[in-house]
């Protein structure tokens, strides 16, 4: 992108803490990352949430008449509410008035809106939601996909996830030759259900990816894999479990530290370490999950996202734009077309 200012469309009305936390994180990103944020939603509510002395050269309010609630059926709501904030924000990307979009609202609505407005990349049957997990090797995250977009998958879909994930890992996460694994119940080629067995063979035969075999649950955070593929049903359970790990570990540590003066001294000594542990394991540090396979950079945030998560999601979106991830994915469409039925 060079020196061009990256423009991020923000669904300001999406999420449990919208618009205040969404706006706060977006404004911080405009100040610290040098991006321009387009806040889409109710102008009055957004204006009220803006911090004093906001630099309006990098913050723009884009009116939207409606919002999609978490309990609405996503496809029907997206089609019915054409002026909903997620649709207006997605249209900004479609018209190339924004380079990327972030929403912490209804993830199903975000996916439906992206498919209807942006469309799929050539050769992609099903987009996948990919999220970055920390591993025991500092600075070496693993990309997991799908974590919720497709609860039922065919082997061909998982093969495409592996190709898309490899491209993203290489060009955005900076992995030299991404090691791809298939989430399974054993490392042997003969383990797993029919989906796993058929997918394993497809991945093994695909010369466009560096498939190193099955990944068991214990391998997910080992740092041995750069990309792990699974269906969205299993992936979403894995995501929610992983999000809880950091809080559980910190809570156990707090309970096990001795009480009294010795405990206070120990806590003071360990405080910097505990903070670093929290940062490495906190999903807010990554901010959002990417909807990979649509014709645009789309970040989906947790419904409970607060300002730090929003900031980090926008950072991820900027990195994806700066690293030209869409151009890289589009240039690989022949590889995607070559995937087997």
Curated annotation (Swiss-Prot):
<keyword id="KW-0443">Lipid metabolism</keyword>
<dbReference type="GO" id="GO:0008654">
    <property type="term" value="P:phospholipid biosynthetic process"/>
</dbReference>
<comment type="subunit">
    <text>Homodimer. Probably interacts with PlsY.</text>
</comment>
<dbReference type="GO" id="GO:0005737">
    <property type="term" value="C:cytoplasm"/>
</dbReference>
<comment type="pathway">
    <text>Lipid metabolism; phospholipid metabolism.</text>
</comment>
<dbReference type="InterPro" id="IPR003664">
    <property type="entry name" value="FA_synthesis"/>
</dbReference>
<dbReference type="GO" id="GO:0006633">
    <property type="term" value="P:fatty acid biosynthetic process"/>
</dbReference>
<keyword id="KW-0963">Cytoplasm</keyword>
<keyword id="KW-0594">Phospholipid biosynthesis</keyword>
<protein>
    <recommendedName>
        <fullName>Phosphate acyltransferase</fullName>
        <ecNumber>2.3.1.274</ecNumber>
    </recommendedName>
</protein>
<keyword id="KW-1208">Phospholipid metabolism</keyword>
<dbReference type="Pfam" id="PF02504">
    <property type="entry name" value="FA_synthesis"/>
</dbReference>
<keyword id="KW-0808">Transferase</keyword>
<dbReference type="InterPro" id="IPR012281">
    <property type="entry name" value="Phospholipid_synth_PlsX-like"/>
</dbReference>
<dbReference type="GO" id="GO:0043811">
    <property type="term" value="F:phosphate:acyl-[acyl carrier protein] acyltransferase activity"/>
</dbReference>
<comment type="function">
    <text>Catalyzes the reversible formation of acyl-phosphate (acyl-PO(4)) from acyl-[acyl-carrier-protein] (acyl-ACP). This enzyme utilizes acyl-ACP as fatty acyl donor, but not acyl-CoA.</text>
</comment>
<comment type="similarity">
    <text>Belongs to the PlsX family.</text>
</comment>
<keyword id="KW-0444">Lipid biosynthesis</keyword>
């Amino acid at each position: 992108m060079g020196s061009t200012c990256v423009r991020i469309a923000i669904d300001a009305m999406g999420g449990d803490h919208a618009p205040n936390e969404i706006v706060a994180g977006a404004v911080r990103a405009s100040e610290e990352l040098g991006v321009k944020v387009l806040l889409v939603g109710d102008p009055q509510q957004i204006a009220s949430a803006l911090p004093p002395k906001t630099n309006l050269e990098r913050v723009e309010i884009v009116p939207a008449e409606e919002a999609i609630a978490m309990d609405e059926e996503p496809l029907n709501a997206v089609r019915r509410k054409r002026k909903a904030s997620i649709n207006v924000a997605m249209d900004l990307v479609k018209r190339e008035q924004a380079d990327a979009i972030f929403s912490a609202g209804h993830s199903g609505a975000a996916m439906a809106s992206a498919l209807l407005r942006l469309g799929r990349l050539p050769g992609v049957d099903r987009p996948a939601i990919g999220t970055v997990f920390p591993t025991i090797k500092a600075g070496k995250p693993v990309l997991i996909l799908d974590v919720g977009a497709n609860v039922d998958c065919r082997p061909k879909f998982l093969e495409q996830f592996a190709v898309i994930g490899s491209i993203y890992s290489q060009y955005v996460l900076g992995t030299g030759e991404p090691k791809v694994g298939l989430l399974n119940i054993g490392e042997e080629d003969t383990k797993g259900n029919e989906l796993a067995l058929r997918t394993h063979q497809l991945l093994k035969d695909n010369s466009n990816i560096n498939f190193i075999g099955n990944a068991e649950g214990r391998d997910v955070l080992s740092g041995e894999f750069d990309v792990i593929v699974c269906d969205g049903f299993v992936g979403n359970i894995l995501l929610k479990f992983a999000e809880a790990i950091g809080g559980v570990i910190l809570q156990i540590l707090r309970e096990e530290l001795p009480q009294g003066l010795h405990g206070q001294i120990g806590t003071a000594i360990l405080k910097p370490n505990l903070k670093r542990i929290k940062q490495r394991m906190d999903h807010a540090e990554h901010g959002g999950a990417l909807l990979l396979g649509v014709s645009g950079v789309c970040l989906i945030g947790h419904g409970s996202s607060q300002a730090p998560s929003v900031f980090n999601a926008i950072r991820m979106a900027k990195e994806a734009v700066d690293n030209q991830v869409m151009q890289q994915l589009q240039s690989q469409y022949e590889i995607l077309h070559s995937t087997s039925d």
